[in-house]
Amino acid sequence: MFSDAPILIAEDNLYVAPDLSNAVEDMDGRVVGPASTVVEALSLLATRAVAAAIVDCQLADRDAAPLARRLAERGVPFIIHTATAVPRLIGDLHPDVPVLIKPLQSSAVLTCLLDEMRKCAVFK
């Protein structure tokens, strides 16, 4: 379904990150990451092509606001997948970004990501 699209996974949970990675690969996507910190995710975004992203709003080093900002600046569709409340800064700057609350099956997360990619014309 992802047709070899590179999908950035920014997730610091040791169980969720590999589960999402496997699910992306099972749906013919290429995993970029997973990144457990904002610094790592921004580095990957600077050096790798990314078609879309799944972002936990609280990573190991800080909240993901800088990553969300950079993704939006580049026009990369993304979704928030979190177990905590979305930080106000992310919610205020990106009110239209879907927020999925953990726990949630990976298939539901990826269905939502595909919908966002279609809205942004990454897939038609």
What are these regions (language model features)?
Residues A46-R48, R69-V76:
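Conserved phosphotransfer cores of two-component systems
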Residues M1-P6, V39, I90-G91, I101, ...:
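Non-catalytic signal-transmission and effector/linker regions of two-component phosphorelay proteins
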Residues V55-A72:
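Conserved phosphotransfer microenvironments
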Residues I79-H81:
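Hydrophobic/aromatic residues positioned on beta-strands within the core alpha/beta folds
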Residues V97-V99:
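Conserved phosphoryl-transfer motifs of two-component systems
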Residues P34-A52:
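Acidic, metal-coordinating helix/loop segments flanking the phosphotransfer/catalytic sites
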Residues E11:
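Conserved acidic carboxylate
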Residues L14-G33:
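Two-component/phosphorelay signaling modules centered on CheY-like receiver
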